[in-house]
Each structure stands twice: as C-alpha cells, then as structure tokens.
Curated annotation (Swiss-Prot):
Gene that encodes it: CLE20
SS bond list: none
Gene Ontology biological process terms in this record: cell-cell signaling involved in cell fate commitment; maintenance of root meristem identity; phloem development; regulation of cell differentiation
Gene Ontology molecular function: receptor serine/threonine kinase binding
GO CC term (a single one): apoplast
Keyword annotations: Developmental protein, Differentiation, Secreted, Signal
Signal sequence range: 1-29
Organism of derivation: Arabidopsis thaliana (Mouse-ear cress)
Residues in coiled coil: none
Name of the protein this chain belongs to: CLAVATA3/ESR (CLE)-related protein 20
Stated family: Belongs to the CLV3/ESR signal peptide family.
Amino acid sequence: MKNKNMNPSRPRLLCLIVFLFLVIVLSKASRIHVERRRFSSKPSGENREFLPSQPTFPVVDAGEILPDKRKVKTGSNPLHNKR
C-alpha cells in the first residue's frame, strides 16, 4: 500500500536536506580535527627533539648585522612633500 500523503517530490527533498546536513557536519568535523591536531598544547613525538640532518649556521652577534643604507634619505621624497 502506498501512502497517499507522500507525493513524489517529498522524498527527494528529504534526501537533499539530509545530504546537505551531512556535508556541513562532516566539513566542520574535519576542520575541528585539523585545528586540534595542528594547535595541540602537547608536543607530539615527532616535534619533541630537533635533530638537523645538516649542521646549522653559527649564531651571529647583534653587532655584526649592519642595517642597509638608504638610497633616498627621509624627507627627500617629492611625493611626500606635496600636501
């Protein structure tokens, strides 16, 4: 026996609603899982100790780093002088 209250478009609409609901829930769940995994407070076994395969460069003192000299001095830009 067929249900007289069910027309042919109603099951399709119900399937569409359920499908959209599942897509939204699954997309949110995957994002939450990735964020928890990426920003967890506990360090994972892989990240606990850093062992470089190649030797790292020596640390440079602050006095050894010289700032680059500016080619244009401050205040000599004609676009900034026009007001």
